[in-house]
């Protein structure tokens, strides 16, 4: 078989659709269950086409097990920002959207753009990310319950109070698990200490950065980290329309949220950062776009 065979994968919670494309308008399509049995059936089905380049969208927990499975088997796999696939689809003026059509679109994107090969993060970093995400969800649930309690009828207040107590205990337990997990792995412990040596970065932010960025080796310059968080300014101008710069928000919303308040704190506490902020204020409007540059 030729080297230009690509496989587009459209991931859903319970299944995934695939499209094997070898050029022109010829596709081989099929769908499989999104579990280990489906992964094995998928690779068995592909055996005649064993030199493929796989491509899927970065869909978080739904797609990660399959991406890891393919990587462990030695296949070439790329994991692409969904925004890039969406823009590619708009350029093709697609009229319909189905899982099969999306898989074909991803295959064509892979063939034309040759995205970089995806490398899985170390298992200890994946576990840390899972813990940090779980902690964030628990905190969101706690805030929701506290808001409900503030307006609840007296007859259900006791139930809300019990749930709040349980959530606080789970939050505390998860925070302790995170600390122990970092202490158990010298690499994580060392990188966390390096992050906290930077003025303005405390334990909470260092843990979040460690979970989402790792040791930073997959980023070649700071601009890539900013883009990964979706904090890069995006300017829209057309003809005589002079648009304002806005955050692209084409990245990790969780990381963006974690960085925003420390950036504002740095503006108030760090003279160098404050001077940079004042210079940017004279050039741009919009505190969020300016704060992104402070990072």
Can you annotate each of these PLM segments?
Residues 203, 208-291:
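Phosphate-backbone recognition surface of nucleic-acid-processing proteins
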Residues 62-67:
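Short, well-ordered alpha-helical microsegments
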Residues 51-59, 106, 263:
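Acidic beta-strand-to-loop metal/phosphate-binding motif
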Residues 2-21, 106:
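Gly/Thr-rich phosphate-binding beta-strand-loop-beta motif of the actin/hexokinase/Hsp70
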Residues 71:
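Anion (oxyanion) recognition and catalysis
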Residues 13, 60, 84:
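Short, glycine/acidic-enriched loop or turn micro-motifs at the edges of active sites
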Residues 75-194, 198:
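Long, charge-rich intrinsically disordered scaffolds of nucleic-acid metabolism proteins
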Residues 21, 25-53:
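Nucleic-acid-processing active sites and adjacent nucleic-acid-binding tracks
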